[in-house]
Amino acid sequence: WRDWMIGYESSHIEYVDPDGEIERGPLENSYQQQYQKRYYAKIKDWERGIERELEDLTTVMLTFSASNKNDLGGWRCPADHMRDIADGYQTAYSTLWNVLDGYEWDFAKVWEPHQSGYGHMHLAVAVEDPAGSISAEMFRPVMRSYVENTKPAGSEAHGLTTPGMGDAVSVNDDVGDLGCYIAEYVGMFGEEALERSISTQLFYATCWATGTRRVEFSGRAQDRIAREQFRRETGLRPEDRGGSTFDQWRGDESGGESGESGESGDESGSWAVDSICTVSGGSPTYSDPTAGGQRLTRIDGREGVDPPAHRD
């Protein structure tokens, strides 16, 4: 991971602009400070969006974790530990849909590093709750589903032995400092990634090796973020002019990022990725942008080498 990060210091990406000219800029990744600032802007846009659009807002924070020891008493492989949590979350998410059936809600999923170097997951949920009926106990089936389908996840750590769900589920009747909490979880403020503690870098390396995004927004949350960005950039409301201006703006934004052509079917007005290069001493060395990526492979027999510990 460190070698990969260091490689970004001299890496650039080249685009073909709408006039056919080559434009070059630094290649970025989500662990760099400038990228973190965009993450934070999105988080704050989501916070503003739910506060603006949900009149009777309730926020819920659910925390999913797992033991970092294996069944042999040793340390669990960090990648397997992260996958344990991610796989268990998928079953919990299905239960969450049932629990919140009939409500308008959206969420942000966030991974936070622990001082041990392992990670755990927070799910920040924003719910329109006009009757004030949302309580922590409503989410007991969600946490039970997670524990039952995640062998190294304990009942006590997920509030199942505690009335009110303990620290595993927290409910607030406003947005509060939700954006700041999420930013703190992700570690958006502070030192550059390669200057952080070894435990934090271990967590980053695990996210990188498993292809895990540290922050993800639901589709509805992404829509709110886009509307807030539109307000900020244009000074208009998304519903102005029947929403057509917002739709056009969003289409232009999407096309500009992806390099897709517009409605006319030609390439005019679009940007396209041309190549990736390393610049050293002023002379670029080019690479095929389609040749990279991660290749994930299961190791035969790994269950016997690193079996997850069972927690009641």
Predicted regions and their residues:
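Short hydrophobic/aromatic beta-strand micro-patches
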Residues: 124-128
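Right-hand nucleic-acid polymerase module
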Residues: 1-117, 129-312
